[in-house]
Amino acid sequence: MSKCSFRKWLIHSDAIQDEPLIGELYFPTLPSEIAAERTSEESHSNGESMMSMNEQQKKSLNRLTAAEMKWSARAMASLQDSIRFRYSKAWLDNGFPIGADLPLQEGLMKPLNAARLFGFLADRALDGTSALWFEQAFAMGSQGTAVPADASSIERQSILLPHCEAHAGGIRIRSTEGEAAGSTLPIPMESNAAAGIPLAIQNAERGRADLRSLLAIAAATTLPGRHSPRVVVSGRDEEVMTLSRLDDLCSIPVWREIYMRLARESGIETAQTRLKDVRGSTALLTSRIDRAAGKPLFTLSARTLTAGRMGSYLGIADILNSDGASPAEDLPKVWRRMAFALLTGAADAPERWLFVREEFGWRLAPAHGWRPNT
């Protein structure tokens, strides 16, 4: 049986003064034979940079997934089940739980119900497609971020690839040497991104991406979501750019803007949005609700704060009833948003409900988007 080694990460909050240490996270590393397989595959991909992206992705996934599955069978336990977290003593004395799956208690904890990630990591993890675009950029020679060969896919997607500064929420992850984890590529300006990113994504989706296209995508990729929201700098603030995908049945940016306008007219507090024409298609730009005056806020999703009651509006209300800073003010907002989603048929999900931590508990963050239920 292969012995599992762990990589230690330090979990801080960059939304709280002096960036206190929340705890320690331990990620299992891939065995040496799989790390060697990955290194060999990346070198092989680098020599095939003119091959279509779809072919490269398929070959990489097939080789690495087969190797990881083989090791998991030998170890008689999946790699994902081995993640560990432990709160710091100072946080145990003065902090708060950073998810329903991480109660404020001593000792090492594992994700509930054999989940792949803790909730706070799932809130920041990139989707598989975005991660693959990063991987291909590295294979073609990008020097933007150092990614260890023995890092598993979930460690890459949740720690090593989200941007070191523009990541979701207010949790910063550092190495034991104190270096902030994540991509170091500069976040693009809106004026440059409006022209470059849509074209780069179109090339990637059609299997025609080159290194320049991949870097354009990777630099703006900091947030989770199927539609690969891209972060751009507009003036002094960061905004989230949402674009359509090739397999969309309708214009997702346009329909999201329709829902946001209807919500505002219904008295629901929302993020600020605007539509922008980019190369003949439409993009939706949304203000970041996990930032205030350019600084991060400590946010967690309803999915993370409810754990076993995912998808339940009652579970969302319980967050405010049990640990809300102002439940009398926020509970009517929950009802209004619930009624809006039900009456309009808009797709709703617990990961899209964000809560901001204040001194006396959680506050409901403004709504930041619905999508058509297609």
Spans of features found by a protein language model:
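Phosphate/dinucleotide-binding and metal-coordinating scaffold of catalytic cores
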Residues: M1-T374
